[in-house]
Each structure stands twice: as structure tokens, then as C-alpha cells.
Amino acid sequence: QPAPDAMVLDCGCGGGANIKTLLKLCPNGKVQGIDYSAVSVEKTRKINARAIAAGRCTVQQASVAELPFEAEQFDVVTAFETVYFWPELAQNFREVYRVLKPGGVFFICNEANGETTKDDKWTQIIDGMTIYTDTALKKYLEKAGFCQIQSHKNKKGWLCVTAQKL
């Protein structure tokens, strides 16, 4: 769980629900969100309008390939259900590493874990989707410089991975 005053970046913020939750977890912190989709950015801004007005949240259209932030700015970076669509995972993870503060944590959460037959169905119907196993994610994270990489799977197959920048 992030510290109450954490600076958090949510990559691929989608409809903004995770940002809303992160704002509650970090009542004295700030949460920034990016998404490649203009529609998602607008939805996220709508659902988090109060936090934006209070200066606790910003949301912008951007790509994880070139994060529009200074180096070492965030305590936590999250990616919920989004790394499936990142075009260059190794380079994208290096960008996340760049914007994390030393000691910062990257948190990835995916409904699909790359180890079930249902995962094949998704990649067949959704163009450009790649489902990664925990082993594959760990290799990419290590190449980007992350350490203390841990993965957890629940009974429903959700995969959560944490990685730290030292």
C-alpha cells in the first residue's frame, strides 16, 4: 500500500476508477494519470473532477513510451490491465524506471496471466494484445533495472507483480 503522502502515476488510467481508489489510499498525496486514448482521459477527468479541482490529480493524454515527467518523480507507478498493449515492453519499463524515485515501486496487475486457455481467446479477438506470464514480465523488469520482483496469482488467475527501483 502506498504511503498517505505518496506521489503516484497510473499508466493507462482507462476510465479513472483506479485513480479514484489511489486518491483514497493517498489522502495527502497526488495522483497523476496518463492514457493513450483521448476518450479514456476525458472519462478519467470526469470521474475525478473534485480531486483535479483540488490540485490532487492531473490526467493527460500520453504514451508510456515517452512519459511526460521528470526523472525520479514518483513513489509508485501502477499499470492495471494495460501492459498487454504496451508496444515495446522493455523500453516502456525503462521509462517507468526513469520516473520512479529510488526505492519506488512499480505495480502491475493483470486479469490474464498467460497460463490459461482463456488467455488465448483474448489475444485472438483483441488486436495487438499480448498476455505475459510472470516469468516473462520478470525478465523485462530485470532488464530495465528493477529488483526485488515479486509476483502473486489469485485463484481466479489474476497476476500482480511488484518491482522496486533501488
Annotate each language-model stretch with its function.
Residues 105-162:
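C-terminal alpha-helical "lid/dimerization" subdomain adjacent to the S-adenosyl-L-methionine
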